[in-house]
UniProtKB/Swiss-Prot annotation:
It catalyses: carboxy-S-adenosyl-L-methionine + 5-hydroxyuridine(34) in tRNA = 5-carboxymethoxyuridine(34) in tRNA + S-adenosyl-L-homocysteine + H(+). One of its GO terms (molecular function) is methyltransferase activity. The gene is cmoB. This is tRNA U34 carboxymethyltransferase. The keyword tRNA processing applies. The keyword RNA-binding does not apply. One of its GO terms (biological process) is tRNA wobble uridine modification.
Length: 323
């Protein structure tokens, strides 16, 4: 059973303590509910991983843990087998004691695009909405953050995060909670809030922006990364049944339209930090994610379009401040 007690104890002593009025009951309710059919298998994989304290830990340039003496072939095989029980691995990569998890996404590339535009993360308390396996949270810690809290309701991602945490020496500087943004009270407690790869999955994108704003302290920074299309401030794509084979894509604005949405929600100092086409080098099938990936979602005769005929995925990073 994954234990959230350490997180409760941690926030009881800081400016997130008011979250304890609602959070333990929400987590207890989550634990009582019907779990995913494979949750026991996933949590067992975490439990059976060895407890290792890394001799060398690099979270600044990657997520890499190494031991002082190389692990035996049997130890490495044990770790690899247990981590493969947590497939598919979508966000990474991770290098853990000789086990290299080559994930579907090169999330390190996204981090390299985002990091130069951020306010200094040193000492900050951060919320990562839709954090997946938690890769970017570890990079936030590497960049100096005091505490990174991720929320994502996907149970496999929770187990992947806990597996990585265990192999990083049970590091308590990052925590993942199996919740959605709509389950959070207006905490107004985070110095930086990240929402990367979430907005286009929301039926009401402006409501999502308000929810993000409600988590920020005054003068806090929002980092928003999402799909965009080319166009002016009035351009928004509303896909039909699917976009790049995804059913749950609702609104894809232009970067300029997204800037207007942020302004409408009361954000200031809004800037478009980066716009990049997603390539099949950044998102692809690997040994750790063996099903379809981006190459299968693009028109085989015209990779500038999805199989449905829409513009191929392009992502923008916008930075804004809550006044």
């Amino acid at each position: 059973m994954i234990d959230f007690g350490n997180f409760y104890s941690l926030i009881a002593k800081n400016h997130l303590s008011h979250w304890l009025e609602t959070l333990p009951a929400q987590i207890a309710n989550w634990q009582r509910e019907q779990q995913h059919g494979l949750f026991k298998q996933w949590s067992n994989a975490v439990e059976f991983l060895p407890e290792i304290k890394p001799y060398r830990l690099d979270l600044l340039h990657s997520v890499t843990a190494e031991s002082e003496e190389p692990l035996s072939a049997g130890q490495i095989k044990r770790i690899e087998t247990l981590m493969r029980n947590l497939m598919p691995w979508r966000k990474g990569p991770f290098s853990l004691y000789g086990v290299n998890i080559d994930t579907e996404w090169r999330s390190d590339w996204k981090w390299d695009r985002v990091l130069p535009h951020l306010s200094d993360l040193t000492g900050r308390t951060i919320l990562d909405v839709g954090c997946g396996s938690g890769y970017h949270m570890w990079r936030m810690i590497g960049a100096g953050a005091h505490l990174a809290v991720g929320i994502d309701p996907t149970q496999l991602f929770l187990c992947q995060f806990e597996a990585v945490r265990k192999l990083l020496g049970n590091d308590q500087r990052a925590h993942l909670l199996p919740l959605g943004i709509e389950q959070l009270p207006a905490l107004k407690a985070f110095d930086t809030v990240f929402s990367m790869g979430v907005l286009y999955h929301r039926r009401s994108p402006l409501e999502h922006l308000w929810q993000l704003k409600d988590q920020l302290v005054n003068e806090g920074e929002l980092v928003l990364e999402t799909l965009v299309i080319d166009g002016d401030e009035n351009t928004v794509l509303v896909p039909g049944d699917r976009y790049a084979q995804m059913r749950n894509v609702y609104f894809i604005p232009s970067a300029l339209a997204l800037k207007n949405w942020l302004k409408k929600c009361g954000f200031v100092d809004i800037r478009i930090a980066d716009v990049s086409v997603t390539t099949t080098e950044e998102q692809r099938r690997t040994e750790w994610m063996v099903t379809e990936s981006l190459a299968d979602f693009l028109d085989p005769h015209d990779p500038s379009k999805t199989v449905e005929g829409y513009p191929a995925p392009k992502r923008a990073v916008l930075i804004a401040r809550k006044p």
